[in-house]
Swiss-Prot record:
Biological process, per Gene Ontology: tRNA splicing, via endonucleolytic cleavage and ligation
Enzyme class: transferase
Organism: Pyrococcus horikoshii (strain ATCC 700860 / DSM 12428 / JCM 9974 / NBRC 100139 / OT-3)
Protein name: Probable RNA 2'-phosphotransferase
Keyword annotations: NAD, Transferase
Amino acid sequence: MRFKVSKLMAYILRHSPWEFGLEPDEEGFVSIEELVNAVRKVYPWVTEEYIREIVERDEKGRYEIRGNKIRARYGHSYPVILRHEEDKESKVLYHGTVRRNLKGIMREGIKPMKRQYVHLSINYEDAYNTGRRHGEDVVVLIIDAECLRNKGYKILKAGKKVRIVKHVPVDCISGIL
């Protein structure tokens, strides 16, 4: 059940807080109490402790609690100001997608589409699993992080295993697995 509640939290915090009567601040934070009340519209038994446990156990670090407020750390489809630490260490990152997207990617690079940032993974497995959400015929792109930095792109640490960047130019894609 934790998975379903976490998915609802991600939907609310990343895409549709207003649908649930929430007003995020410029960084995407909302009151934990208000989020609990919003989630209770679907899962009436949810408590603040349960929400905090989801945040604590989340392997990807999707959520952030600051004081009595909570937000999604990445994946927003509405404008938010993210002040994440820059990743200056990674040499290689990965992006999972489905084969049908390759032609466009190899022409225009990886674009954020309906989100603010392109999501990259620090390992192959997570990138592959991300790609699987979009179909069976998954390919994993190898991203040269140094190339991104040399072109002036900032790679941000959005979660424990997730990095975000505004765009990945074609020439920073160093391979396809």
